[in-house]
């Protein structure tokens, strides 16, 4: 089930995360947050990135990950099933699947949204595609277009 509405969204996030076959799948987007499922191949990573305007919460549902944080990747955190990491806006970070054989299954919550609603990346993007680089126009465009339409739909019709 995918939701791109400003409505209450109920899902068994563990079940959906474990069965997600895609590198990245956006399943819920609201004006203030976004729920994204991810599946990383053995030794695959989420690129070293920074979200200037987004807080990010990452929870590991299956597997073991290494989280590197800081401009110089100077802090290392080992994350196992059931653990989470909360990354404040403006913090450099990278998530790495530490397994040689098993997929890493995780979900992440961005606040505010960081990817176009409903986006699915079957494989890890090779260049850009993270939505986190300041020059990434496409993702910023969709992010603010979505916010604009949500705001516009909340204004009484007689004022439109």
UniProtKB/Swiss-Prot annotation:
Principal location listed in the UniProt entry: virion
Pfam families: Cupin_2 (PF07883)
Keyword DNA-binding attributed: no
Residue ranges annotated for the Cupin type-2 domain, each copy included: 37-110
Keyword terms of this UniProt record: Virion
Compartment annotation: Virion
The keyword Chaperone belongs to this UniProt entry's keyword annotation: no
InterPro entries from the UniProt entry: Cupin_2 (IPR013096), Flavonoid_dioxygenase-like (IPR052538), RmlC-like_jellyroll (IPR014710), RmlC_Cupin_sf (IPR011051)
Source organism superkingdom: Viruses
Cellular component per GO, a single term: virion component
PANTHER family linked to this entry: LIGAND BINDING DOMAIN PROTEIN, PUTATIVE (AFU_ORTHOLOGUE AFUA_6G14370)-RELATED, QUERCETIN 2,3-DIOXYGENASE-RELATED
Entry protein name: Uncharacterized protein L612
């Amino acid at each position: 089930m995918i939701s791109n509405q400003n409505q209450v969204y109920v899902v068994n996030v563990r079940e959906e995360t474990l069965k997600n076959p895609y590198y990245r799948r956006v399943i819920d987007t609201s004006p203030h947050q976004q729920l994204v499922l991810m599946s990383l191949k053995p030794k695959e990573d989420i690129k070293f990135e920074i979200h200037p305007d987004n807080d990010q919460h990452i929870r590991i549902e299956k597997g073991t990950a290494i989280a590197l944080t800081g401009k110089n990747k100077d802090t290392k955190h080992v994350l196992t099933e059931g653990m989470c990491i909360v990354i404040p806006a403006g913090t450099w970070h990278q998530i790495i699947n530490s397994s040689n054989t098993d997929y890493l299954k995780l979900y992440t919550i961005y606040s505010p949204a960081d990817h176009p609603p409903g986006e699915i990346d079957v494989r890890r993007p090779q260049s850009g595609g993270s939505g986190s680089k300041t020059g990434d126009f496409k993702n910023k465009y969709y992010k603010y277009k979505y916010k604009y339409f949500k705001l516009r739909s909340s204004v009484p019709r007689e004022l439109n």
